[in-house]
């Protein structure tokens, strides 16, 4: 089994539904995001174009974050998902420095919540209860939520344009494997040699 994702940029409208769904599902503190949509503007009026690129952990086969981790906290599980064992994480941030995609986050200070000065609400205390100061956090394809093997990652389910397809790349009959075989795809930062398992179908002319 090797989980992966194909993102069709022809279908992405930059709505950030994936960003919101990820944040809501994982209950991340203010300022912490496991995914986001990058916006790049090209050209000039009246021929300006907006290029949207959803960004998340690539769950690389040759993950730089895993190789530099001195404690084994960053690892690839049996399904090829790059994860963090927070019991082993010492907060050295080597993995953040090594990741060329800048998709890891570090909780550097006590969580203040969305209403500064008023303390955490009861809901926020529940949501943020699993986060520890001095630890690194990232996307795990919703493995920690138990969604991966069933309904799939929250970002995939939330996309109104069906731009994301998730599944087992090792299963030739899976939708994601068939899409990978049928479309011209690319990975971000191929020059880094990390072999991501998140692929992109480019827009026309991109």
Regions found by a protein language model. Give the residues of each.
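Non-ligating segments of multi-cofactor redox enzymes
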Residues: 1-206
